[in-house]
From Swiss-Prot:
Name this polypeptide is given: Large ribosomal subunit protein bL20
Keywords for this protein: Ribonucleoprotein, Ribosomal protein, RNA-binding, rRNA-binding
Gene that specifies this protein: rplT
GO BP field: ribosomal large subunit assembly; translation
Organism of this sequence: Aromatoleum aromaticum (strain DSM 19018 / LMG 30748 / EbN1) (Azoarcus sp. (strain EbN1))
Molecular-function GO term, any one: rRNA binding
Length: 119
């Protein structure tokens, strides 16, 4: 049985971690043991925040829709209820975009929602 020397694989593993830690401050960028922990924590934050980003954007869209709906005399919940009754299936991302960049189109949707709520 021949002897296995680990120098090449260890160096490759260390290099991989230190490359991932590029741009970090202090010893986190050039000390393997500390960089490894920093890279692992960064990965945990990235995993968590990829999920939180979806929640945060949905909350932002709802806040924008609510603000625009109140400008035309509705609340968010009544506006969304009116759209549902009018069978208008526009997602919150598009509604928020209309609320910010195309106010007349948003007002037209609000009028349709209001008409269905009154009926």
């Amino acid at each position: 049985m021949s002897r296995v020397k680990r120098g090449v694989t260890a160096r490759a593993r260390h290099k991989k971690v230190l490359d991932q830690a590029k741009g970090y401050r202090g010893r986190r960028k050039n000390v393997y043991r500390i960089a490894k922990q920093a890279v692992m924590k960064a990965g945990q934050y990235a995993y968590r925040d990829r999920r939180q980003r979806k929640r945060q954007f949905r909350a932002l869209w709802i806040a924008r829709i609510n603000a625009a709906a109140r400008e035309v005399g509705l609340t968010y919940s009544t506006f969304m209820n009116g759209l549902k009754k009018a069978a208008i299936e526009v997602d919150r991302k598009v509604l928020a975009d209309l609320a910010v960049f195309d106010k007349p189109a948003f007002a037209a949707l609000a009028d349709q929602a209001r008409a269905k709520l009154a009926a």
